[in-house]
Amino acid sequence: MSAEEVRAVMSAPGNDRLVWNTPLSEEHAARLIAACDPAPGARIADLGSGWGELLMRLVESAPGATGDGVETDPDAVARGRKLAGERGLADRVRFHPTPAAEWTEDGYDLAVSIGSSHAWPGATARESTLNALTALAAAVRPGGRVLFGEGIWQREPTPAALEGIGAEPGDFGSLLELIRLAESVGLRALQVTVADEREWDLFESEGPIGRGQRWALANPDHPLHAEVTAEIDARRTGYYGGYRSSFTLAYLVLSS
């Protein structure tokens, strides 16, 4: 059995327990939306949108606002289009199966990218983050806003933490380093928050680890059972024995 089949079992777009593919509570999301404060008729882009739940909520928060979800995962795009249709947003939220780094529309009032900096090629992960911030700054009008989500270390990573997240020592910096990186491309922070431990625990439990475990319990005789269980165990070791409490996701609401 292939690694692709195991990933399909544990995939985020097929997991209806995940509201969004990021460690984010409802209360935290509401604060991000309030800080972004899209005006009526705002144009919003989400680069690397997944199925676009956050994009749709931003659009719903502002009468007449429209959104472009830019996403290459066909399963995520299909889920997003279905959700938009069910919520009466099909004419206001559109999904584009285009790589985020190739999206060239600009003049947006708000540009969003959560955990997708890897979509912008760079010689290092840090360079990809800089390239993502540069692209987001270019996508918004003067005075527009950017919502950027990126991984940071809250303390010096251990070898187990690096292995668990699959990172090299220089891939992620501190929260202050991320803020300074945004400033280097002309983006100033209006609000800075990070995912807390409870958000991460719930995300991991509802996400690939939990989805995989629920599937394994329901399918004990499936040919993929042993491989899925091994993947669950590896992810548990990586999170609980590695990056839990040291790595997190920062959410920066920025102004151009």
Predicted regions and their residues:
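Conserved class I S-adenosyl-L-methionine
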Residues: 41-50
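Short, glycine-/aromatic-enriched active-site segment of Class I SAM-dependent methyltransferases
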Residues: 148-169
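Conserved alpha-helix/loop element of class I SAM-dependent methyltransferases that forms part
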Residues: 23-40
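A short glycine-rich, Lys/Arg-flanked "PGG" loop and its adjoining helix->strand segment in the class I
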Residues: 127-145
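Conserved Class I S-adenosyl-L-methionine
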Residues: 191-256
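A short SAM/SAH-binding and catalytic strip from SAM-dependent methyltransferases
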Residues: 110-127
